Amino acid sequence: MKYYIVAGEASGDLHASNLIRSIARKDSRAEFRCFGGDLMKAAGGTLVRHYRDLAYMGFWPVISHLGTILSGARMCFDDICEWAPDAVILVDYPGFNLSIAQKVHKKGIPVYYYISPKIWAWKSWRIRKIRRYVDEMFSILPFETDYFSRHNYKVRYVGNPTVDEISKYLSDTKRPQVLTDDGRRIVALLAGSRRQEISRNLPTMLEALEGIDCIRPVLACAPGIEPEFYDSIIGGKEIEKVYGGTYGVLEKAYAALVTSGTATLETALFGVPQVVCYRLPVSWGVKLIRKLLLRVRFISLVNLVSFSEVVPELVAGDMNAVDVREHLMPLLSDTQERRMQLDGYDQMKDLLGPAGAPDRAAEMIIFLLEQRTRQ
């Protein structure tokens, strides 16, 4: 069968590449054509256009490049129509992908969505497009099944691919050791993946660590961010930097300061107690917008999956060096706070379930397509 896959950022490229491999193992005649990235190409997809050509984040960058984004969407749709796939698989990236879903669905091509848009947090009105134009949704967060059910749409939870990535990493007996032990307890710093995010969060993280004895701060640097950018923020502070080795840092870490996102989940799956830190441009307006528009109690995936505050979250004006330090200190020794986080991680892992997310998604997609051909 012919599968057209669309992913719009680095994480989507990774998850889509694993899905391609899973489908290929189960469908020996599978062909793949992609709007995506290098990993999808390496997995066997014919790359039509790279996601970086359309990767604009934030209100003004999107508005100023709207023409490029719209022309990219038209090109994607035209290419889909010309290639005539048996299915279109969309991976996250909802702003772009839901517009593709709308057009493709009208052509009678089945649309499958792997990694649900996070409409439970933001832009819940997108459920209308999902109900109309997405044939099947495959979720990677267990609580999403209840959320979508309340909105009269059934999603299938397939497991979380981060579990797969970490299981694969830990099972590699030849994995490189990026850090050697020197007796000090490593505090991992995961300050975000984008420059704006890093510049807002890293200075406060570094300030919070000043004067704490017997720790070894290690910064896990994001891919695509040049060393000079980090150096401009760190200044003269002696902070170890590791490039391309976040899992290697987490494997050795005793505690961590982490911005929100998948990094919080990765940190928990490695069993590293953490403080979630996320600074926004501080103003009463931002706080008001957050209260009015964000529909969730928590920002970290650990707490969202667990339905409780397993890890402390310091957000916006609450994210300051004093409070970060206050929440970090109990995690640096064998305390009740540390043990409670680790117990919470165990419960979260049970909720996420075992590895195998891309395999389960692939099996369902192939089964659904076979059902269609028999009708």
Show the residue positions of the predicted features.
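Nucleotide-activated sugar donor-binding and catalytic core shared by glycosyltransferases
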Residues: M1-Q375
